[in-house]
């Protein structure tokens, strides 16, 4: 390959501000500015073969009919979170793989799997070989709870648990012990709801999905009958969407187990809520009203609000999780900006498993690429990677 002086680009900003489709113009402008002084066709390297990487490749290929795109991926197979992060009972979300496959089969796009950039090849070497390097390698690390006991057996990150039932190679030996009645999930986003749904779904439903065989066997033997989804703020700040909440409500042989006191005074705020938030809140309030006192179903799930983890409590053997201690919070402010403030009161919940779904973070990929450890991001200006002095580093971009 001819050596061409290149750079790194940060497309994360472009995707966040413009959206997947709106990024087309920004990418087109970027490609037009590629240095062509060598007289060769522009060559772009994309590090990371997940959704952000393939959307970037797709738009680059549309922007110019002479650009060549190489996609490097640490795993042997492409598509990242679409393949290993989407719930197995949501096949419609995975349909985008068909589009990504067409992109991967494009005559000017080349996929290179099982290549660990930063180890097998450095970013500096890539910058010498390409006009531009796009960093879209995702967030592969878990955010820690930072509480005593989180290293006990029976405590998992949602990322690892999802990877386990979806067949992510690094999680296939996770082997969670489902020989307990209650599971506590920390976090109230869609990933938390996905995990809760998989734990409580009837086996006949799961057998129709592409869930891994080892996960299906473990869930067949599972004794889990109750899942509590805990959040540090209130019902008006749930991060999950109405579709996922409705799926939980409609799950066969399962009933909602909510605390009516959590919704006190909420009805007075409905008229001022944005429509999506209003619909979700009305659905929750209706569920609380309809299911009050109804615990006849075999399995139960519910939200617990205004609670933050303080400590994972060990069980009788001192080695496994046996419960979790939660700080009781109150809200200061209102709406999306409301902050959870501890009241000083504590509450213990008995459980045999704790799953943390409080988000992921990126890791540094290469010593030559600047990285802000506090925010776990690559510093960038409108997608262009910045050095430690805040100056642009050539044509390096971030995405995803």
Predicted regions and their residues:
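Beta1/beta-strand and adjacent pyrophosphate-binding region of the FAD-binding site
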Residues: 38-50, 178-189
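N-terminal Rossmann-like FAD-binding beta1-loop-alpha1 element of flavoenzymes
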Residues: 42-66, 192-200
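Glycine-rich dinucleotide-binding loop and its adjacent helix/turn
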Residues: 142-221, 375-386
